[in-house]
Structures are given as structure tokens and as C-alpha cells.
Amino acid sequence: MKFILPLFTSLPVALAWLPGIDKDIYSAAGTNIFNVTSASSKRWLPASKKIRGVNLGSHFVIEPWMASMAWSNMGCSGQRSEFDCVMALGQETADQAFADHWGSWITQDDINQMVQYGLNTIRIPVGYWLKEDLVYADSEHFPKGGIGYLEDVCGWASDAGMYIIIDLHGAPGAQQPKQPFTGQYAPNPGFYQDYQYDRALEFLEWMTTSIHQNNKFRNVGMLEIVNEPVQNADQASSMINSYYPSAFTRIRNTESSLGITSNNYLHIQMMNEKWGSGDPTQSLTDNYFAAYDDHRYVKWDSSVAVDKESYISASCVDDRGGNWPTIVGEWSLSVPDNVEHTADWEPSSNTDFYARWFAAQAIAYEKQEGWVFWSWKAQLGDYRWSYKDAVDAGVIPKDLDSIYDYSPC
């Protein structure tokens, strides 16, 4: 998905901006958290200054499985998605409930703690319904008022010197069936139609304009045009051949109309070919500004034997290359559901294993452009999905460079 010194020495000069390459980014206090040596050196140093980030999961697109207490406190118990909750509560009550959630799930203290833990990037999942005039008032039900809270989070992260990826996590019509991460529990994916692509493209234009014109978005350098589409190349063919190139054209035309110079363009991110939706570059005429997202959940890889040494070994040799540049934008320490609570895998008594496995995965993903863990926090009582809890448990070190001292491989 994005950035490292070789990326910028081998490509043409007109490039999307990346921190420490095209321009440095600083916290409000003047600190450059990507550069620990000097202001003039390149940011991405092997084993030190790759992308190291966390997802703000369940902030703007709530997934009830990982935020059950918050979901219940909002009055949404028993509802499967944001769409269902808003429909059940009614618009006015839902808007207040969601505003309370947005104001408390991720705070400025969280952002500051991320920096203290050595993180330099956040990925923010959002839904198309942030642009409220895209929502069909007679048939769609989503909370209103989220954009101001997105501005706040991006402002805090920019003030802290962090890099920001905004990800279209919930697409019009839903890009996957029966998945709350789309914002609705649709029986079938309705995204793969021209009129839905048009709505998504309008969202991307609006988001691009907001990023370039609102100072709180100043450290947003990447816009992902859809998260986790269907893993079926035939079903996704119109997305690859129509929506992707149209997204590039519409985003670049928007930037040109705003007078944005090429070194300040956004990176445009797509799921990589490993995801299974097809080759994202197939119909692109210019991919110099492209970046790629890889989601690596070993727990769902049936080719890896379910024992600790196999998990470590698989991660040690895990090559996430292919489309380039790639960031591993989602991963975790979770293991298969049928063993996750057994003695061999129970979190509290196996911290040494999970620390080794975290190191093995992070080192592998830093052979690409870095990683973004899913997620910063969860309400599962299980650090395998919660970066914050894993640090508290001693599984993830605050000094992330020390993972190379673990020698897990």
C-alpha cells in the first residue's frame, strides 16, 4: 500500500505523498515520529520505520461481535448492524446514541497512547453514509453526524504526527453479504452495479476534497476505495474493470481541480491480488499512485497446521509480496475458533507463544511496507484482537524495534 525508500527511487517523480519521502510530518510539538535520526533523512528505515499501525475498528463502523458492551449501551442489543440498529431505534434516538459512541470509543488519550506504544499510523474504517446525502431516505438507515467526529480523530492524529489511512469499509449496497463491517446485514452483495459504483465514486470525490481542504485531515495520505470485496473474480469483474479505474480518474480529477500538485496526491489503495477478487491493476492505465492492502488472518488459512510451531514457522516464511507497494492492513493474534479457548492456546497462560508469534508476523510484514493490526481495542476480554490489551499483557512490546531481538524464526 505505500511507502519505503526503494519505492521512491525506482518510480517516476510524480508520486502520491508518503511521510518522510515527499514531505515530513510533525506533531503539534514539532516531533517527527517517523524519523528518529535527523529531519533530512528518509523515513522508512529497515526494521525500524515501516508503517506500524492499528485499525480503529468499531469506531465509525461498529461490529457488534467485538464491541458488545458499547453496542448494548447504545440500545442496539440484538441488532446485527448499524442499519438494523438505526431502523430499530429511530433516527433521532440513534443519532444521539451513535454520537455518544463516537465521542468515547476513540479519544485523544487513545491517540497519544498509540504514539507512546511506538505506533505511527492509524487506519480508519468508514462507511459511505458519512456523506449523508448519498443515503436513500426511504430505504436506508444509518446514523447522521459522523463527519465531525472523523475530523476530530484525524486532527488528534495529525497533531500527534501520525499517518492516516481512510478506508471505505462500508460500500453502497454492501460489498459482502451478511457482514456487519459493511454497515448492514445484506443477504446479498448489492455493490456490484453501476448505480452503486456511482454513489461510491461520489463519496470518494467528497472525501478527497475534504482531505485536501480541511487542515485536520492534513496527515491523511491514503484513501482505500473499498475494503474486502467478494472473493470471486467473476462476481467482482465489473469492480476491477469499471469501478477501480473510475475511482482513479475521479480522485485525480478532483485533486487537479483543487490545484493539488502531484507530490501531494493521495495514494489510492485497493485490496491486493492475494485477496481473491482478481488483479486490481488489470484495467488501470496508470498505477504509479496505487497502493495495495493485504489482510492476513492465519486462523482462516487451512493450509497451516493448527499447532504453535506450525504457526510460528508459517509466519516466519510468509511472503505477502505480489502487488507493490503493499501494507498488511489487517491481521491479529487470533487462532481458529474451535481451539482458541483450549489449554494449548488460552491467552493468559501462553503469553510467551503469542509474543513470539506477534514478532514473527510483524517481521514478515515489515518485509513489505509495514502493517496495521486489527484492532486498537475490543471488548472481548481477549488481547488477541486488541493491541492495547496485548501491550498491557506484555505480549506486544512498547519498543517495537525490540521484536527483532526475539529471533522468533
Swiss-Prot record:
Signal sequence region: 1-16
PANTHER family: GLUCAN ENDO-1,6-BETA-GLUCOSIDASE B (PTHR31297:SF39)
Natural source organism: Emericella nidulans (strain FGSC A4 / ATCC 38163 / CBS 112.46 / NRRL 194 / M139) (Aspergillus nidulans)
Keyword Signal: yes
Keyword Ribonucleoprotein found: no
Active site: E228 (proton donor), E330 (nucleophile)
Residue stretches spanning the membrane: none
GO terms of biological process kind: cell wall organization; glucan catabolic process
InterPro entries in the record: Glyco_hydro_5, Glycoside_hydrolase_SF, Glycosyl_hydrolase_5
Glycosylation sites noted in the Swiss-Prot or TrEMBL record: N35
EC number: 3.2.1.75
Organism superkingdom: Eukaryota
Family note: Belongs to the glycosyl hydrolase 5 (cellulase A) family.
Lineage: Eukaryota, Fungi, Dikarya, Ascomycota, Pezizomycotina
Catalyzed reactions per annotation: Random hydrolysis of (1->6)-linkages in (1->6)-beta-D-glucans
Protein name according to UniProt: Glucan endo-1,6-beta-glucosidase B
Keyword vocabulary terms for this entry: Carbohydrate metabolism, Cell wall biogenesis/degradation, Glycoprotein, Glycosidase, Hydrolase, Polysaccharide degradation, Secreted, Signal
